Structure formats: C-alpha cells, structure tokens
Design a protein with these regions (language model features):
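Short catalytic/metal-binding and nucleic-acid-binding patches
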Residues: 1-231
C-alpha cells in the first residue's frame, strides 16, 4: 500500500477508439474522477491518447486492481455503443502496471505521460493535445469538474452516478513542495518536447497536428483521414 505506479491500457487492435474530442474527454475525465474517489487512488498525471491511456497514480489502500477494472469497464460500456460497436474495447492483456520506486522514477514517468502526444509526433507541445491531458499547473490546484455525460448515464435512480465528479491532481508523496514539483515536471517535459522536434526535423518530418488527429477513423490503425470528430 502507498506505492506509486505508471498505469497504461491499450484499445483493442490499437484502434483509435479514444480519438480526442469533447465527448470522449468529458466521459473519461468524469469516470476517472469517480473511480479515483471511490477507490481512494491519488492521480498525479493523465493522458488519453487515441488508442491508449497513461496514468501516474499512488495507491494508498492497495485498491489499484479494483480501480482499473472499474474504470476500464465503465469506459468500455459507454464508448462501445457510442461508436456503434459491441466487441471488446480494450486489448486482451490487462493494464500494464509499472511500480515507481524513487522520486526520480515518478518525475520521469509524469513527464513521459505528458509528453506522449509529442513523442508520438502528433503535436509540438503537450498542452496542444486535444484529448484529456493534465497540465503541470493543475497539480495541487483546484479540482477539475466533469459533468456526468447525459448521453449514456441515467440522470435518476438509486444507481445513478453523481451529477458532477471532481478530479484533483495531487503531488506525489515525498517530492517536496507543489511549486518545486511543477517546475521539475515542466523542465523535464520541455526537454522531451525539444528532443522530439529535433528528431522530426532530422527525419524531415512534421508533427501530424490536431486537425489530422481528430480526422482519423476510430477503427484504423494507420493514418486514415475519413471524417471529423463526432464521437
């Protein structure tokens, strides 16, 4: 109990089932907030990519397996009908869970998560990612509010989830002040962003860009521009 972890989960067949748009961001943020509160898991960083998810969390009560099962199940139940599909939403393997043993491990993985869209050649800065992405400035700040998506969840009834869920991004334990940790995250993130830009320039390539990311088909593994983001 009390360990910190990098948690990752891929969509089935690497399909872009979590392609970023307002509905997907609202849904995942809401369910993450609900799950974190229910299982008392502390969230430090999150990035929802088109075909996978990364979280950095601390698990004070050793409830991480229940947390991931609950979150993954609700995301699948909501997104599948939204996409007009009924097959498995997630890849058959379970979530990848990597224990973070030192403060340096935690800092490195938080920066890794936030730099994911940049390292993948999608956007030049992590903050430009149109999906759910936790900014360093949100660490230790006011909770982020997500309204319950009315397009899937019941508004009334004994089993109804809360109308508003609040996600609080907290500083990992043992890493000093909030301000110091934010600065360290920003510095590490910027270093990755600079390296990614240099690598693309060397390869004579460009970042894909938000418009093309959102125009990808949810069901393609490659870059297949078909329609605008409507899910």
């Amino acid at each position: 109990p009390g360990g910190s972890y990098l948690v990752s989960r891929r969509c089935t067949q690497r399909q872009f089932l979590l392609r970023p748009c307002q509905d997907t961001t609202q849904l995942f943020g809401y369910l993450l907030a609900v799950a974190a509160e229910r299982f008392h898991v502390d969230v430090h960083a999150v990035c929802v990519m088109s075909n996978h998810v990364h979280l950095v969390v601390t698990d004070p009560e050793a409830r991480l397996p229940a947390f991931t099962r609950y979150l993954d199940s609700l995301v699948a139940r909501a997104m599948n009908p939204r996409l007009g599909r009924s097959e498995s939403f997630w890849a058959p393997s379970r979530s990848s869970v990597v224990a973070l043993q030192t403060p340096a491990d935690i800092l490195g993985k938080v920066a890794y998560v936030l730099a994911n869209p940049v390292a993948a050649g999608l956007v030049r800065r992590g903050r430009l990612w149109p999906g759910l992405w936790s900014a360093p400035a949100q660490l230790g700040a006011a909770a982020i509010e997500f309204k319950r998506p009315g397009w899937f969840f019941r508004k009334k009834g004994k089993t109804a989830l809360p109308g508003v869920a609040r996600l609080r991004l907290v500083t990992p334990p043992g890493l000093g002040s909030v301000e110091d940790f934010r600065r360290e995250v920003v510095s590490a993130l910027q270093a990755i962003e600079r390296q990614a830009a240099a690598d693309l320039a060397t390869a004579h390539r460009e970042f894909l860009g938000v418009r093309r990311v959102q125009a990808q088909s949810p069901f393609g593994e490659g870059i297949r521009i078909r329609s605008g983001c409507s899910t």
